[in-house]
Amino acid sequence: MLIVRPADSSAWTVWRPTGERLPIPALVVAYDDGQRLLAAARKGRATLELTLTVESPYLYDVWQVSKGRVPQRVVHRVTAGNTAEVRVGYGDTGAPWANEQRFGWRPWQEYSWNDGRRMVRTGTTRQEFVSAGGNWWQHRVLHTLGFDLWSKLVGGLTEQPRRYAADDRETESWYAPVVRPAVPATGTPVPTRTGDRLDLRVPEFVDADGHHGWARESGESATVEARVSRDGQQIADLSDGWTPVPTTAAAARYRLDVSTRRSSEQWRWATRTDTAWQFTSARPAGTAAVPLPLLQVDYRVPADVRGTVPGGRPHRLGLTLRQPAGVPAPTGTSVRVEVSHDGGRTWRTVPVLGHGTRFTALVPAGRGAVSLRVRAADRAGDSVEQTVIDAYGLR
């Protein structure tokens, strides 16, 4: 069905991949184009040939800049001299489509004018061209489709603001396993202590590339429990929000427990996580905020864009230990890894090779999904125990 709009009405429409599908497809054209189509139809049998692209393998985020002048005619040519190339993998966590938005602003701007989110099919890789130079960019991806296409994208995972050089050829992977609570390696936020106050903001969802997000902005229901203990006694419950925690001056042993629960058709991996960080802290000298030594584990899973690895043979799981920015790198480290193929009901210790901050675990063949339980510690007494149920899939 072809619908010709009146002369005083717009033919503008929006396609969405979700919703009811009618048995007869309909297309809308503007009045002037419609008149030519009607004239051709009146002359006899007319054929209309259409080429449609539902999911383009390319995307352009272009910023046209004219320094020190206002040109009479604005012309922008995308070239290798002014544009970076980024291959972006949009991870499939269960939903067939996702929202994404790359916010952009000039150095003198205080906020971005970008106001429209975009749709992208999950489980795909797209070649994206981004203007280089002095522009600031920040990419954000929500693992499913939101209800509003016109407001800025708030939820999901976010990268740190960055610039591109024209010769940059980079890759991004969104929602790559293992997604878990973590202090991002790419920057803020960093847990700190100022005097006798602890600021323990830890994003509940961080992927393998360091993109981070918060449960309250996740786009769907998630349960979070967070508690702080000092010398074995609970001193704060942060389950309702990350607020400063008052403490005492003397050196003490602290423990931060963070648990997440999220399971839906749109979220098949990392359905449950339990993380416990332990460290020692005393009142620091001065009034500046001092980063806290919450030992981190970064994971390197040889997964595809759907978050799965071949299950018919063993595979290697990479693990890297690090401290938050501002804390010396860990030394005298140890790592223990257990895996489960039945959702955490039974566990099996696996071989771990490596030293320093880089280790490799050999995960046995299996079916379904891999759950992980990792224990790591360093010479300073900092430790982390992290359990991720259904961390990634087996195909």
Question: Which functions belong to the PLM regions below?
Answer:
Residues L50-D61, G68, T171-D196, P284-P310:
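Short, compositionally biased P/S/T/A/G/V-rich stretches that sit at domain boundaries
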Residues D92-A98, A185-E217, T320-P328:
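Short amphipathic, basic-aromatic surface patches that mediate peripheral association
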Residues S229, E338-H341:
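Conserved Ser/Thr-centered positions that define the repeating blades of beta-propeller domains
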Residues T243, T357-A361:
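Short strand-edge motifs at loop-to-beta-strand transitions and within beta-strands
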Residues A252-Y254, G368-L372:
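Exposed beta-strand face motif in extracellular beta-rich ectodomains
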